């Protein structure tokens, strides 16, 4: 009987040796027809391990880096995306009045993607996008109490009692129960700037919480969801794929 280590090594070797034609790989990864995949390859825009390939018969493995027009093509499987949402974009596939944040993505099979938690049209910052329903449910389901941290700029001065009241829960208009305890950290009192962490996602919740305290949110920016922090390297409108560590953090 093989040891667990030997079995693991064998599985790894099998994974590396499993080969598939490049045109088949592109069909699966891009949702393209065989004819479309062949055209893409012959264009000269496809590289395998940094070498231009013009034959769909070339075999690739899971360890190969396949790029099309300079962007790595993700292997088959769920996609996990971090987007820096700018002001003026809505988190939906269609909207009759505003741009949808999906126009910022250069992805195939866009219809399979959805937002793991939304932001208001005028709120900026971290948005997570995926085609993995179980993963996004872990973030959005109220029972999991996934923490979200926002940077908030208020119209008026930060009240001395805000932190205590937010920790106790705020009674919101048209809500039967008070909000769950939230934590607040003052960043710059002279600029009415603070960080707020909540563990639920009611409609316009942050804005309504401060309205209930007699203040108004001038600007709102989401910085963190769970242990996933908005990448400082991203500019508004840019995105990247999550690392495996970031993906796995949602389950911890």
Language-model segments: residues:
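Basic, flexible Lys/Arg- and Gly-enriched helix-loop patches that mediate nucleic-acid binding at interfaces
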Residues: 2-252
């Amino acid at each position: 009987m093989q040891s667990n280590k030997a079995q693991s090594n064998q599985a790894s070797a099998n994974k590396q040796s499993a080969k598939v034609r490049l045109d088949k790989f592109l069909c699966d990864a891009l949702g393209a027809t065989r004819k479309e995949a062949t055209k893409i390859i012959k264009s000269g825009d496809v590289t395998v391990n940094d070498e231009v390939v013009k034959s769909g018969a070339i075999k690739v493995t899971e360890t190969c880096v396949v790029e099309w027009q300079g962007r790595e093509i993700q292997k088959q499987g769920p996609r996990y995306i971090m987007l820096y949402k700018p002001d003026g974009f809505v988190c939906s596939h269609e909207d009759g009045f505003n741009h949808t944040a999906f126009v910022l993505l250069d992805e195939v099979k866009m219809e399979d993607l959805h937002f793991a938690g939304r932001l208001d049209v005028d709120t900026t910052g971290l948005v997570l996008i995926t085609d993995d329903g179980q993963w996004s449910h872990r973030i959005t389901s109220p029972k999991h109490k996934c923490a979200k941290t926002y940077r908030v700029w208020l119209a008026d001065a930060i009240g001395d009692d805000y932190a205590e009241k937010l920790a106790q829960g705020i009674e919101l208009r048209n809500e039967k129960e008070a909000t769950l305890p939230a934590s607040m950290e003052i960043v710059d009192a002279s600029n009415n700037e603070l960080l707020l962490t909540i563990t639920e996602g009611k409609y316009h919740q942050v804005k309504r919480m401060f309205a209930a305290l007699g203040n108004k949110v001038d600007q709102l920016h989401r910085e963190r969801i769970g242990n996933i922090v908005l990448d400082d390297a991203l500019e508004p409108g840019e995105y990247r794929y999550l690392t495996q560590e970031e993906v796995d953090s949602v389950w911890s």
